[in-house]
Amino acid sequence: MTPSTPADDAWIRSYQRLLPESQSLLASRRSVIPVAISRVNQFDAARLDVEMSAMLKEQLVKVFTLMKPGMLFQYEPELDAFLEFLIWRFSIWVDKPTPGNALMNLRYRDERGVVAQHLGKVRTGLEGPGLTSPQKIWYCVASVGGQYLFSRLQSFSAFRRWGDSEQRPLARRLWTLVQRIEGIYKAASFLNLLSFLYTGRYRNLIEKALKARLVYRSPHMNRSVSFEYMNRQLVWNEFSEMLLLLLPLLNSSAVKNILSPFAKDKSSSTKEDTVTCPICQVDPAIPFIALPCQHRYCYYCIRTRCASAASFRCLRCNEPVVAIQREGVSSGK
C-alpha cells in the first residue's frame, strides 16, 4: 500500500492555518522592553534648560538697558513666558529635543503609542513614536501658560492684598483657594518626585499627565570624558589663593622701584612727566621735592611712602630719598 501523495498546495494551506496562531504567540511574547533611563541625566537636562532660559533672558534684558529703569520688572512674567514659548516652538513642536535634552542624549516618547511593532527586527527598547500634536500643544499650555498664569495670579493677589484680614470675604476666599491649590500642587509634585526616583519615569506632573517619557535618542552614545576644564579650574583656584596670600606681603613701591628701570628709558621722560607726581600722576597741590634728586611729589604721597618704607627710592630716577622739602623753601624735611 503506497502512501497518498499530498497536494501541491497543502503546505500553503497549512501555513495560512498556522500563521494567525504564530503571530499571536509572537505578539504576546514581544511586550514592551523595559529600559532604564539615568535619573541624573534627566535632572541635568532640566537644569540645563533652566540655565539656557536664564542666559537668553539676560541677553534680552541687555537690549533694554538704555530704557527707563524698572520698566521690564512689571513685564517679567510675559518675558519669561515668551522665552519659554520660543524654546518650545523650535524644539518640542518640531520634534526636536530641548537644548538640555540634546546634550543629555534624550528625547520625548509617547508611552501610549509604544506597541509591539516591527516584528522580526532587533529592538533596543528605545523605539516608539514622538509626541503627537495634541500632546505638544497641551505641553505648551501646561508648562508655558500655566506658569505664566500662576505667576500673574500671585503678583496680582499680592498687589491687591487678598491675604489681609480686613479684605472682603470674596478676596479672602480666593486667597485661601489659591493657597490650597498651591499646596496640593506641591504635595503632588513631591509624590511624583518620589515616584520618579523609584521608577525613573516622568520628572514632573506635566510629563506624567501627558505620558511623555524621556528616553535615549541613540542607544549608543560615546561619552568623551575630559577633565581638562576641571584641572584648569583647580589650578586657577590654587593660583588665585596663593596670590591672595602673597600680595599683602609685597611692598608695591619696592616692586615698582625694581621694575621701573626696565619700563622705559630715562631720556624718554617729557616735561609733563617731571611736573606731575609720579605716584598719583596728577599736578601736586602741595608740591614737595625729594632730596637729593629734586623730583616733584605730592606731600601726602611722598610722606606716606617715606613713612612706610625705611629706604624709599625715587620713582623717576631710582635714587634713595634722604629728605624732602617743600618746593621753593631753602630747608626743611
UniProtKB/Swiss-Prot annotation:
Effect of residue 161 to K: In pex2-1 mutant; defects peroxisomal matrix protein degradation
A GO BP entry: peroxisome organization
Subcellular location: Peroxisome membrane
Entries under InterPro entries matching the protein: PEX2/10 (IPR025654), Pex_N (IPR006845), RING-HC_PEX2 (IPR045859), Znf_C3HC4_RING-type (IPR018957), Znf_RING (IPR001841), Znf_RING/FYVE/PHD (IPR013083), Znf_RING_CS (IPR017907)
Recorded GO CC terms: cytosol; peroxisomal membrane; peroxisome; plasmodesma
Bilayer topology term: Multi-pass membrane protein
Listed EC numbers: 2.3.2.36
Residues exposed to the Cytoplasmic side: 66-71, 159-168, 251-333
Pathway: Protein modification; protein ubiquitination
Free-text disruption phenotype from the record: Embryo lethality at the heart stage.
Annotated effect of mutating residue 55 to I: In pex2-2 mutant; defects peroxisomal matrix protein degradation
Tissue-by-tissue expression: Expressed in roots, stems, leaves, flowers, pollen, ovules, seeds and siliques.
GO MF, one annotated term: zinc ion binding
Chain ranges of zinc fingers (RING-type): 277-318
Entry binding sites for Zn(2+) 1: 277, 280, 298, 301
Domain of life: Eukaryota
Catalysed reactions listed for this entry: [E2 ubiquitin-conjugating enzyme]-S-ubiquitinyl-L-cysteine + [acceptor protein]-L-cysteine = [E2 ubiquitin-conjugating enzyme]-L-cysteine + [acceptor protein]-S-ubiquitinyl-L-cysteine
CDD domains: RING-HC_PEX2
Major place of residence: membrane
Domain comment in the entry: The three subunits of the retrotranslocation channel (PEX2, PEX10 and PEX12) coassemble in the membrane into a channel with an open 10 Angstrom pore. The RING-type zinc-fingers that catalyze PEX5 receptor ubiquitination are positioned above the pore on the cytosolic side of the complex.
Assembly with partners or alone: Component of the PEX2-PEX10-PEX12 retrotranslocation channel. Interacts with DSK2a and DSK2b.
Role noted for this protein: E3 ubiquitin-protein ligase component of a retrotranslocation channel required for peroxisome organization by mediating export of the PEX5 receptor from peroxisomes to the cytosol, thereby promoting PEX5 recycling. The retrotranslocation channel is composed of PEX2, PEX10 and PEX12; each subunit contributing transmembrane segments that coassemble into an open channel that specifically allows the passage of PEX5 through the peroxisomal membrane. PEX2 also regulates peroxisome organization by acting as a E3 ubiquitin-protein ligase.
Family: Belongs to the pex2/pex10/pex12 family.
Name by which UniProt lists this protein: Peroxisome biogenesis protein 2
Species assigned in the record: Arabidopsis thaliana
Gene that this sequence comes from: PEX2
